[in-house]
């Protein structure tokens, strides 16, 4: 039985890395945000806006528990906030290997500026505002992220190099 949980801030590459990692390790792949969108037939931002953060975090927790109960031999890409609520981080650590994909503030900011249309929380922010948004959120979240079994530093390298460097650590 093998479960690998990828955690980290938005823009760290959890979904992209997760898909490739799963393929290389011959495991299944699931993205918790995608799973929630399919289950509830709504975008994450719509659930967040319509139901509130507390309700969304409960949904996220329920989906995480369901995935753990139903699937083995899988790479799971979590939402950026998933480890930071309830006992989700403890649950993931007890149920598999957790990998914090840690990127620098500069790299996260650069990636988020390039994809800001797809990220409603930052779509109206300037590059400087995005940088401070990332800094403020990371300060709160790193307490949880750093509880991961593996902290893997994402640098400006090819996806192939990232996977080749990550696989031996898992």
From Swiss-Prot:
Its EC number is 2.7.1.71. It is found in: Cytoplasm. It comes from the Bacteria. GO terms for cellular component: cytosol. Pfam families: SKI. Binds 1 Mg(2+) ion per subunit. Mg(2+) binds at residue 15. ATP binds at residues 11-16, 119. Gene3D superfamilies: P-loop containing nucleotide triphosphate hydrolases. Its cofactor is Mg(2+). Its main location: cytoplasm. It is an enzyme of class 2 (transferase). GO terms for biological process: amino acid biosynthetic process; aromatic amino acid family biosynthetic process; chorismate biosynthetic process. Pathway: Metabolic intermediate biosynthesis; chorismate biosynthesis; chorismate from D-erythrose 4-phosphate and phosphoenolpyruvate: step 5/7. Keywords: Amino-acid biosynthesis, Aromatic amino acid biosynthesis, ATP-binding, Cytoplasm, Kinase, Magnesium, Metal-binding, Nucleotide-binding, Transferase. Substrate binds at residues 33, 57, 80, 141. InterPro entries: P-loop_NTPase (IPR027417), Shikimate/glucono_kinase (IPR031322), Shikimate_kinase/TSH1 (IPR000623). GO terms for molecular function: ATP binding; magnesium ion binding; shikimate kinase activity. It catalyses: shikimate + ATP = 3-phosphoshikimate + ADP + H(+). Catalyzes the specific phosphorylation of the 3-hydroxyl group of shikimic acid using ATP as a cosubstrate. Belongs to the shikimate kinase family. Monomer. This is Shikimate kinase. It comes from Azobacteroides pseudotrichonymphae genomovar. CFP2. The gene is aroK.
